[in-house]
């Protein structure tokens, strides 16, 4: 929302509704994904260091203006997907959840295990019933209070593996089903997908997973995690790298072919 406009400064929900939505409709799109909706202290984090999971970011306007944006999109036939960050939270103590009751372990993992080495943020303890209740109630809140049409779950790869998938090639079956898998996080994602689709079978869930976890979009009753779609990050990341780092005459057609075909054919991918 904030960066979707040409003016200097942060854009607002109202400006997005009035200026951007009509252009999206004219371009023929039927869905948008809104990022950085939940409140976050540092704008440069792109909304991924969430401090208040139940507050729409006030830097873009009021909750009512966000609801107006979503309603306007629906009136144009455009679905609105929220970028949902349940993979980690900001480490700030004053405005975040960390040390909320004086210790590390209320909803989060403690010590080194509870710190993400790349994101400099804190990690949820998905094995705690209190954490599950907090996150699941947050899922329901955004759907029922703001009328979002579903979620793109951020950082699913980080959630699925105890080492967060850092430095793993994911080339062997043991990479997906060994001791490194965070079974408690898998259970949470299954619960979240169950809740969402019980509330409305037309709600959409999308997993940002770069590992290619088998079954991520399979039905839960078949042993899957229950997402509707997987967000394929490999191709856009490849294009960005190619355009930034290589001259056109140096493009490798084998790399192009491999990247464009390297996906699971039974998984619906965006």
Language model regions located:
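Conserved alpha/beta catalytic core and glycan-binding cleft of carbohydrate-active enzymes
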Residues: 147-149, 164-270
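Active-site-proximal beta-strand elements of phosphoester/diester hydrolases
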Residues: 1-2, 270
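Substrate-binding/active-site clefts of carbohydrate-active enzymes
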Residues: 2-180
